[in-house]
A protein has these predicted regions:
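Internal helix-turn-beta structural module
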Residues: 314-368
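Active-site rim loops that border cofactor/substrate pockets in soluble metabolic enzymes
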Residues: 42-50, 203-244, 248-253, 280
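Short, glycine-/small-residue-rich phosphate/pyrophosphate-handling segment
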Residues: 114-145, 160, 165, 285-322
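N-terminal beta-loop-helix "entrance" segment that forms/cooperates
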Residues: 35-59
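Glycine-rich phosphate/diphosphate-binding loop of Rossmann-like nucleotide-binding domains
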Residues: 7-24, 28-33, 151-228
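N-terminal glycine-rich phosphate/adenylate-binding segment common to multiple enzyme folds
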Residues: 50-159, 249
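Glycine-rich phosphate/nucleotide-binding loop
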Residues: 49, 234-338
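Buried hydrophobic positions in well-ordered alpha/beta secondary-structure cores of metabolic enzymes
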Residues: 12-15, 69, 135, 173, ...
Length: 368
């Protein structure tokens, strides 16, 4: 029986309320199904930790991440007014901790399943199922290289992409497409590269590398789309897509559009992979005004726990771990289909604890 070492890193804001709920979902899946063991290590980092200690993260965190199989993390950054007056305002610490947990430890590829769970209502007309997968380049692109202001009348940012990072990005997209069942429309396995090719040299370079990579995946089609057209088609006809691949900033935008049509930020999970320790986290931010008030949505954290177990289980060829992820997902869907508790952001009136407990009870009822 395999044992998995998982770092639990709530970081800032509402993460301290909801990330332990995701950890509890994983532990409950283990208790119900067996077949795998979990060793959970709770650690601290982020803006609030910096305000209290003067350090961005606890001593030994890099070493703990190096020994871990994955981490379940919250969001970094806290923009409380009083905190902004301190020596550690959110914009100074939040961004570095986020970048450290991504490119700082080599997690240069972002994954976001855009899946509409059963029981959730899609805002798109006549759409009741969505299953698209977004792969985003995290280690390069517009967000990575520091820009600067030029005098009082101009500013400059730099967009740089390299062959090595782009090959890793493309390889991840094609590998995921090969492992999926294809697009819902007709089962064809495909990668759609969305950017502004023909306008920006870096994006033409993306086309070149993706075309080269596609030769090693004859079973996966490669398509190109201008990102504005891609956004339109994602809203009109999401079934035409299987795997979508985008540059960092473009992927950020497309990912949030995808979150909107699959239940919102309070539902969607995301992951950063490829480095020392893969990071799994809810798509939402720190939401500081909800901290400790028992009205934050716990479902994204629970969904993220399911994604962690499924992804690591797939990488390690461990069906027991993947079954744990499936159990959590089925329990989420059971709650939604049976009109169970929903938090205010979903149109309900239930609190964080009651919503989470409903899913935990459902885990005891559903079968795989």
């Amino acid at each position: 029986m395999e044992k998995y070492n998982i770092v639990i890193l709530p970081l800032d804001g509402v993460g301290k309320d909801v990330i332990p709920i995701g950890a509890r979902a994983m532990e409950k899946a283990r208790q119900i199904l067996g077949g795998f063991e979990l060793e959970l290590h709770y650690c601290e980092a982020g803006v609030e930790y910096a305000v209290n200690t003067g350090k961005m993260m606890e001593d030994g965190l890099p070493e703990k991440l190096a020994m871990a199989d994955a981490m379940l993390a919250g969001s970094g950054g806290h923009y409380d007014l009083e905190m902004s007056k301190s020596s550690y305002p959110g914009f100074k610490i939040g961004s570095p901790i986020v970048q450290y947990l991504r490119s700082g430890i080599g997690n240069n590829v972002g994954l976001r399943p855009l899946r509409l769970l059963k029981g959730l209502t899609c805002p798109l007309r006549n759409v009741d199922e969505i299953d698209v997968y977004l792969v985003r380049q995290l280690g390069e692109g517009m967000y990575i290289y520091p820009g600067h202001q030029i005098g009082e009348n101009a500013a400059c940012d730099t967009l740089v992409v390299t062959r090595k990072a782009t090959e890793e990005f493309a390889e991840a997209a094609f590998s995921i497409a090969r492992g999926r069942n294809g697009r819902r429309q007709d089962g064809r396995k495909m990668v759609t590269l969305g950017n502004k090719h023909g306008c920006i040299a870096c994006f033409d370079f993306y086309r070149k590398i993706f075309t080269e990579t596609s030769l090693r995946y004859p079973d996966v089609e490669l398509h190109f789309a201008q990102v504005d057209a891609l956004a339109e088609h994602l809203l009109k006809d999401p079934d035409r897509f299987d795997v979508i691949a985008c540059e960092n900033m473009i992927g950020d935008i497309i990912g949030d559009i995808g979150a909107y049509i699959t239940g919102g930020m309070g539902i969607t999970p995301t992951a950063d992979i490829g480095g020392l320790c893969p990071q799994f986290r809810p798509n939402h931010g720190t939401f500081p005004r909800a901290v400790g008030k028992n009205f934050a949505n716990p479902f994204a954290s629970i969904n993220t726990a399911a994604m962690l177990l499924d992804t690591i289980g797939m990488q390690r060829n461990d069906p027991a771990l993947r079954a744990g992820g499936e159990l959590i997902l089925k329990a989420l869907e059971y709650n939604f289909v049976n009109e169970g508790p929903r938090t205010k952001d979903m149109g309900g009136s239930d609190n964080t604890v009651d919503a989470a407990e409903a899913v935990f009870k459902a885990m005891e009822k559903v079968t795989l």
